[in-house]
């Protein structure tokens, strides 16, 4: 029974991902960079995403997320979770299972506002006390498939066992996004 349920879930995910658009993005802040990829992140239904954030002083974070996009009038809400690998420069590498979501508001054909928040407490984290990620910004489509974006990203790995916190990202960024 478990194999059938797992095969059904995997099939739904693959069907949803193949129908919906793929997006690739890159952002650069003053002291960090972020690279991301997503399947179905701009349409209703299942969405799969992944990203890698790097900071020379505070370490690396890589994550894979699964969400469900739901229409709410002019907004699209996402609820879901992320599996995150953490490698802080000050502390032990580990993982976090974060839960959260986001909102997108498409204004016209070219402009979109967005925000998201994910959190993992100590009970769902290893090597860190907690994981916290927030991102908010605006995206303007220059010419499909290319858009530019600007926003603010905060990603913090709270220290554990006497290790200090590692703010992998904390500041404004600019970026580019391509959706196919």
Curated annotation (Swiss-Prot):
Subcellular location: Cell outer membrane
Organismal lineage: Bacteria, Pseudomonadati, Pseudomonadota, Gammaproteobacteria, Enterobacterales
Signal as UniProt keyword: yes
SUPFAM superfamilies xref list: OMPA-like
Annotated Pfam families: YfaZ (PF07437)
Domain of life of the source: Bacteria
Keywords: Cell outer membrane, Membrane, Signal
Gene name linked to the record: yfaZ
Residues annotated as signal peptide: 1-21
Name of the featured protein: Outer membrane protein YfaZ
InterPro entries found in the cross-reference section: OMP/PagP_b-brl (IPR011250), Porin_dom_sf (IPR023614), YfaZ (IPR009998)
GO cellular component: cell outer membrane
